[in-house]
Swiss-Prot record:
UniProt-recorded name of the protein: 33 kDa chaperonin
Signal peptide: none
Gene this protein is translated from: hslO
Purpose: Redox regulated molecular chaperone. Protects both thermally unfolding and oxidatively damaged proteins from irreversible aggregation. Plays an important role in the bacterial defense system toward oxidative stress.
Top-rank lineage group of the source organism: Bacteria
Protein's organism: Streptococcus thermophilus (strain ATCC BAA-250 / LMG 18311)
InterPro entries with a match to the protein in the record: Heat_shock_Hsp33, Heat_shock_Hsp33_C, Heat_shock_Hsp33_N
Family: Belongs to the HSP33 family.
A single Gene Ontology CC term: cytoplasm
Disulphide bridges, residue numbers: C235-C237, C268-C271
């Protein structure tokens, strides 16, 4: 089971989240049949949203849109505060690696665009904020968003590693944030550690990468574990929801669908679940 660990430095001046999102991203890859670059890009977006959602309270829903003008198209993710996330990438078929190293490429295929966050508190007035993509690598773009839009200096590392068959091997990451009251001396110490820490891909290869991440972030500094939360890829789509969507088309459109197409098939963008509606089903909706 994937998990996210929340921690705070003993001084109360820094907080860090470390997470294992391997099963989340593996499920996304299986559902969307993504190739290497698309898998990594979608996975990084899901991890970023898991971190954002962990910062929210109540029954908020958080939508992250990474909107680029490159080959990927848009990447959309929706998360709740209970550890569930879902998402999709417009082009699941991008598969480009560096010839010399085999490194999966992401940034060049994201292109220029925006990192957008929409937080729905359930009050009917969602809060939207966005920042430009600075690299298209998603992790750096997310850190820039947190620092610029949420006004919280942040360090972020997130990645998805694939095996020789391009299946998800491990996925996860961390977020470190400076809290009010941190001294310049403390900030300098943490900055030095972050600059000197091993690459996120190296830390993810560790036997227990959550512990490896926390050790790299805190070093010898004492810290407290605040909570451990379960994470998963989970879609909340349902037949009833799509029935309601069909009803919004109006009776004439439903009648045409029944007469010309002899039914309807709707595929959920987020999880690829197919919902079949027969002529009899459509007739029932028309008479509803």
């Amino acid at each position: 089971m994937d998990k996210l660990i929340k921690t705070i430095s003993e001084s109360g001046s820094f907080r860090a989240y470390a997470l294992d999102s391997t099963e989340t991203v593996r499920t996304a890859q299986e559902k969307h049949n993504t190739l290497s670059s698309s898998t990594v890009a979608l996975g990084r977006t899901l991890i970023a949203n898991q971190i954002l959602a962990a910062n929210q309270k109540g029954d908020s829903k958080i939508t992250v849109k990474v909107i680029g003008n490159g080959s990927f198209g848009h990447i959309i993710s929706v998360a709740d505060t209970k550890g569930h996330v879902k998402g999709y990438i417009q082009n699941p078929g991008v598969d480009i690696k560096k010839t010399a190293t085999g490194e999966v490429l992401v940034g060049p295929f994201m292109g220029h665009g925006q990192f957008v966050s929409i937080i729905d508190y359930g009050t009917g007035n969602p809060y939207t904020s966005s920042t430009p993509l600075i690299s298209g690598e998603i992790g750096e773009d997310f850190a820039y968003y947190l620092t610029e839009s949420e006004q919280t200096p942040s360090a972020v590392g997130l990645n998805v590693l694939l095996d020789k068959e391009d299946k998800v091997k491990v996925a996860g990451g961390f977020m470190l944030q400076v809290l009010p009251g941190a001294s310049e001396e403390e900030i300098a110490r943490y900055e030095k550690r972050i600059q000197e820490m091993p690459a996120i891909s190296t830390l993810l290869e560790s036997d227990d990468h959550i512990e490896a991440l926390l050790n790299a972030i805190y070093g010898d500094e004492p810290f407290k574990r605040l909570s451990e939360e379960e994470l998963s890829f989970e879609c909340d789509c349902s037949r009833e929801r799509f029935e309601n969507a069909l009803l919004t088309l109006g009776k004439d459109e439903l009648q045409a669908m029944k007469d010309e197409d002899h039914g309807a098939e709707i595929v959920c963008q987020f999880c690829q679940t197919k919902y079949e509606f027969s002529e009899a089903d459509l007739e029932e909706l028309i008479n509803d």
